[in-house]
Amino acid sequence: RKTKMNYMDVVDMIAVATPIKVADNGRFFTVRLPWYPDFKTFYTEAKAIISGIDPDKDPYEAEKTGGSDLLDVVLLSATPDLYFTSLTCTQEHRHGGNYPLMNAGKAVIRGGVLVMPIAMTIHHGFIDGHHLSLFYKKVEEFLK
């Protein structure tokens, strides 16, 4: 695993770094969920990682795994209690924002159709409009 990347490096597998709420007061732990090609395996592994959160440990430990760069992850904040129409994301740009940040909101039924807001902050050098639209099409397929 490389610790430094530039725009010419190719990463064939990424993880999801996401905060998981563990208490009603908003306390959360960041976890790293490895990528698996099939959803069943991903779900099983993600559930085990989330169930195994130790509330006495450092809630940011997962962000320290693999170095401080976080260049092999997609950052995902899930806000299932919030339905939004617009969201502005901020990041500490240590590396020029060359990793995507996504926020997925509350799925609701509007006009008889299941919809879910998704906001993404991306660097055009990392993801172009074509591939971003393919992602949104895949989300639409899952919501049908």
PLM regions with names:
Residues 8-11, 66-68, 110:
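A short beta-turn/loop motif at secondary-structure boundaries
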Residues 1-4, 29-40, 52, 101-144:
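Active-site-proximal acidic secondary-structure segment that organizes catalysis
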Residues 22-84:
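Helical lid/core segments from catalytic subdomains that handle acyl or acyl-like groups
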Residues 17-22, 104-108:
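Short beta-strand elements
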Residues 71-115:
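Flexible, Gly/Pro-enriched loop and linker segments at secondary-structure and domain junctions
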Residues 1-18:
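Hydrophobic "lid/gating" helix adjacent to the active-site nucleophile
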Residues 2-3, 61, 86-89:
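Glycine-rich, charged/polar anion/phosphate-binding loops
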